[in-house]
Amino acid sequence: MGSSFGKNFRVTTFGESHGGAVGVILDGCPPKLKINIDLIQNELDRRRPGQSKITTPRNEDDKLEILSGLKEGITLGTPIAMMVRNKDQRPGDYSNLEQVFRPSHADGTYHLKYGIQAGSGGGRASARETIGRVAAGAIAKQLLKNLFNTEILSWVKRIHDIDSQVNKNKLTLSKIDSNIVRCPDDKVAAKMIKRIKELQQDGDSCGGVIECLVKNVPSGLGMPVFDKLEADLAKALMSLPATKGFEIGSGFLGTYLRGSEHNDSFIESDDISKLKTISNNSGGIQGGISNGENIEMKIAFKPTATIGKEQKTVNADGKEVLMKAKGRHDPCVLPRAVPMVDSMVALVLADHLLLHQAQCSIIK
């Protein structure tokens, strides 16, 4: 319970941060889809620890192992099982935290729910769990790209109080990945990197905002009322570790506008299936259904909860204790969270694509 996501394009992740391996079982992927395995590994490399001086120093190569579901790079329509082995576990780093509830971690709430919790690395609450999501999301991205040329681009918009403004018309994956913080504005990226390093040296951390743009979105994805596309996107993205906020389109800023300013008027077209709007305050979704415009979202991530400063907390007996984290951690999660955001968006869109085809493509 709680480890599966999706209806038709369904993922189930498994494993803990300091266990033997982490992975995913992807069920419902259409057969005969050609998969570039190198692209899956590339997404895992973008997510892996130890990739720069502003990420956790945990040294994992995150080499992908595909156990089932593919034959010579072609999907069989059967469950696709993928796994990455953990090779640099150091559970001893957490020996002083046994039965201690770290502030703003899942230790306390896991203990309250289950009466027991993983003693090291956060267990299932660790960002290491997202390896399975990223692997499955890489397949979803290829499905969407092959069928509709859909492109999902996420980048770091803000770190702490350092914000960026990006020309979305010129945005590319190579530009996003051109620096270690994954902000396509090089001048702002340099300031972000400096801030992260300063906080890291002080034993502290920071959060920020990731922005996501989806191009070439098929119209008609999503369902009314309880299965609205933006509702499922919100659930997917808010399920990522450290997320605390979600906006789509104009978001909260839209509340400052009048209806006459906010409405997205349609443009006359000879092809009703390719309607465009003058503005895109709706963020590509109206009535819970995609309208074919770009989907635009922002996701807020809190500061990394594991910090190098001494803090007061309590243990499993409710007694106050002083603690100082020794484990390896990211001073800011956002640079590595970018491919996680991409993957969750891809999984939602792939799932809704299959749902749409199942309901609306039988009778022409």
UniProtKB/Swiss-Prot annotation:
It catalyses: 5-O-(1-carboxyvinyl)-3-phosphoshikimate = chorismate + phosphate. Its cofactor is FMNH2. It comes from Prochlorococcus marinus subsp. pastoris (strain CCMP1986 / NIES-2087 / MED4). Pathway: Metabolic intermediate biosynthesis; chorismate biosynthesis; chorismate from D-erythrose 4-phosphate and phosphoenolpyruvate: step 7/7. GO terms for biological process: amino acid biosynthetic process; aromatic amino acid family biosynthetic process; chorismate biosynthetic process. Reduced FMN (FMNH(2)). FMN binds at residues 124-126, 287, 302-306, 328. One of its GO terms (molecular function) is FMN binding. Homotetramer. Belongs to the chorismate synthase family. InterPro entries: Chorismate_synth, Chorismate_synth_AroC_sf, Chorismate_synthase_CS. This reaction introduces a second double bond into the aromatic ring system. GO terms for cellular component: cytosol. NADP(+) binds at residue 47. NCBIfam families: aroC, PRK05382.1. This is Chorismate synthase. SUPFAM superfamilies: Chorismate synthase, AroC (SSF103263). The gene is aroC. Its EC number is 4.2.3.5. It is an enzyme of class 4 (lyase). Keywords: Amino-acid biosynthesis, Aromatic amino acid biosynthesis, FAD, Flavoprotein, FMN, Lyase, NADP.
